[in-house]
Amino acid sequence: MGRLLIKILIIAIGISIGIGNLYVTVFYGIPVWKNSTVQAFCMTPNTNMWATTNCIPDDHDNTEVPLNITEAFEAWDNPLVKQAESNIHLLFEQTMRPCVKLSPICIKMSCVELNGTATTKATTTATTTMTTPCQNCSTEQIEGEMAEEPASNCTFAIAGYQRDVKKNYSMTWYDQELVCNNKTGSEKGSKDCYMIHCNDSVIKEACDKTYWDTLRVRYCAPAGYALLKCNDKDYRGFAPKCKNVSVVHCTRLINTTITTGIGLNGSRSENRTEIWQKGGNDNDTVIIKLNKFYNLTVRCRRPGNKTVLPVTIMAGLVFHSQKYNTRLKQAWCHFQGDWKGAWKEVREEVKKVKNLTEVSIENIHLRRIWGDPESANFWFNCQGEFFYCKMDWFINYLNNRTEDAEGTNRTCDKGKPGPGPCVQRTYVACHIRQVVNDWYTVSKKVYAPPREGHLECNSSVTALYVAIDYNNKSGPINVTLSPQVRSIWAYELGDYKLVEITPIGFAPTDVRRYTGPTREKRVPFVLGFLGFLGAAGTAMGAAATTLTVQSRHLLAGILQQQKNLLAAVEQQQQLLKLTIWGVKNLNARVTALEKYLEDQARLNSWGCAWKQVCHTTVPWKYNNTPKWDNMTWLEWERQINALEGNITQLLEEAQNQESKNLDLYQKLDDWSGFWSWFSLSTWLGYVKIGFLVIVIILGLRFAWVLWGCIRNIRQGYNPLPQIHIHSSAERPDNGGGQDRGGESSSSKLIRLQEESSTPSRINNWWLNFKSCSLRIRTWCYNICLTLLIFIRTAVGYLQYGLQQLQEAATGLAQALARAAREAWGRLGAIVRSAYRAVINSPRRVRQGLEKVLG
């Protein structure tokens, strides 16, 4: 009984020691992510040529799942914003399709100024309307104040189809696109001109007369990735801890309108004015989101029925010239809505940014900058024509001033026809240029083809892109229109964040892996995707209990996204194969597959393939332990991020060791190997080995004897032994006669003669062989005896061990039987006593009543 208690105590101690240890556990399907710069792909509801060749059709999936977490957001340093800037530039280039160099046009041209068409009546009308901003002017009134575009008709000679024969050509150019020198001694108005930018860049002509359609796109995360969205009401482009976070698959639909200074057709207009600053405090990069309550719009128009004349210069080179013989009226833009009220609210918000209570809103002024035409003017594209609108009139209207924005030293000249530079107007004059500066790449010029017919664009104004100059606490504050195009995409996409889902996590548990040969089989995957991240804000313990469902959500989402994307790609493969965005869409699909395969390869290297919770044999050696009830997986992963490298290395080493152990275990568990011991062929192999050992030993012994014989032969004959022969007088007294006892001298002589006559070498060989045989026999006998003793001892120990096990089992059975017997007896006694109490209770009650009554 004592031995049994000792054994039970040892087992209990071992179990208690094993329970106290923590081991690394791998979890697959946890809602954790990290920032990513992967290429997103685009969807669009548009069906024009560009949309169908670059984006896949919109699936109208606006699913949004809220997350109970906090996350950092930044609008400008955002990979999604950088992608949008690059992609929209590609859209520009593909829409304009520059393909033919215009280097032949970079020659001297003889130009004559075109005649004007403005009448004195129009000039008088324009002069009488200078005193009011004309908020509700008609189209005729606005066009009456517009000046005429200065243009020239230029002729030049160039070799055409016949290289040795020059041909004269005639084209019409805007004067802003020419660099001219007046001729001396020539006809009046004639001048020598060159096309601008000939010396500093390569100009290209548009092959097709395409134009810029209103295009709306949305960016979508590839499979295995997601978009986080900040929904805080006080979000201003920078939030270290956004509290109202949700996860989406795609962004909202955004417009692709490119402008400078003023944002058009934005998708984030709300009933409040907001100021966004880069990094939360950068005054040079500011977005002012305008209140949609004021209904701010802008209407832009190019008057006249403009026509285009294709001029074939040589084979493969066609230049689209402007066909008119008189000057055209300037284009114009009319700003409509309550701009005064909107600008007043903007001024109040500018004061709140720095908490400048002493500054009057009258000291906050809107300004424009100087530099390239795209920077100094309100620049945008309207149906293929690039408008350059000088904002001085409108800025004077908002600031309630009448000054020349180009400098305070200049006087406002009101003597010239038309309005001067110091008037207030709700509309501005615009120039149209055919040669423009590229807004994305430095110094590159893109040629925009002219459009025929009437042009008009109506847009909503949703933002101002500015730089704020805080001079001092009480001084004037200048709000300067900024030409930074990236602010457009920071405004549109700044509340989104592209993240990569990392569904593999590590945490310590007290469960150690069972290292048996069985493995879990692959499970089927169904359900959706965004619900997978819905558990990001829940505690680790609650999330871990639903890992199977979450991992199914993850893979199902990946497969569904891949299926949708592949179907769209297959439908448009003929169109996608030649476009840059088509390649990016395919790249997004490949990236998702690579990511999923990489995750599965990592799990497989740790022995955790197709497992949602995988226990390991690697001990947890770190002090960090999770709080399963009040810590999210995202918080835990950020806490142990520095330990991931060490943990993965230990997991790989443990898996390699487990593979080796499993291989050995399978060999021991192989019954075919066990029955092979009873095979005669197996034993014949061992017999062969033993026979070879004996033959080798005998061969070595024979070689040793042979070597001894050769050595003796080389030494020569041995000398004869000197034997003393006794005489008859010295014959020993044997107490008898000659016939009784002793050896006669004649017999000794015979033996001596025999010995002397037998060769000594043969005797040595015989003796050596006899001695060797005796030694071998003795050695074999000793080995057999030792082996027999060992076998007897092992059998004895085995019998003793079996006897002890039998006694222990018998003792345990007796103890269990005795304990069961005692427990049963006690239980029976308790039941009997309870039964007696119930049976005897009436009698005891009766006896008690008799005692009381008696």
Swiss-Prot record:
Region V3, residue ranges: 300-332
Intervals of motif YXXL motif: 717-720
Region of interest: V4: 389-430
Region V2: start-end pairs: 154-198
Region feature V1, mapped onto this chain: 111-153
Keyword tRNA-binding: no
Signal peptide: 1-20
Entry comment on modification after translation: Specific enzymatic cleavages in vivo yield mature proteins. Envelope glycoproteins are synthesized as an inactive precursor that is heavily N-glycosylated and processed likely by host cell furin in the Golgi to yield the mature SU and TM proteins. The cleavage site between SU and TM requires the minimal sequence [KR]-X-[KR]-R.
Gene Ontology BP terms: membrane fusion involved in viral entry into host cell; symbiont entry into host cell; virion attachment to host cell
Residue intervals annotated with topology Extracellular: 21-705
Note: This is an African green monkey isolate.
Protein name according to UniProt: Envelope glycoprotein gp160
Gene name, Swiss-Prot/TrEMBL: env
